[in-house]
């Protein structure tokens, strides 16, 4: 075939022709990250329960990205927001494990192994919270340093808090906002959404703040 076609260059893709062609143009991290964003947006559109969720989550979690003020981290947070509801239709006991496995096995070449594990950790905790009795892929224990792992847990717990608080709509997410400084994670809750902030919700917020090594503050406006 090579002799007959007289090709000068042969590109072999490990997953698909599409990925192989795109890989040619992956000249820098920004381009690779952009492709990752596109893939995650496609997954969000195919698996999301309600419109506008990803954008609402990105806006809400933007202040928390300050725990690692780098472009690469902010991009991972955005990707996690896109993927945050990908397993809503699965059995509740299995969602964390399945979400992590889907990221670890996603057939694309636009992520490093560390990025896969980071997103897997974030999505696992988005569904499982801090529970210790849920199934979990062994791969999540590899590659990440202590700080990077803690940051993934924080983002996962923030997504968990937000999606449970949302109660199936994006409107309630517009009624809350986060603030972050060196000592506190603060949550502002508008009067219109205060009925949703029950004791269980308060406990989830405390776990989120403590995962970021900060104290929680709540302002009922």
What are these regions (language model features)?
Residues 2-169, 176-187, 195:
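Helical "lid/coupling" subdomains associated with nucleotide-phosphate turnover
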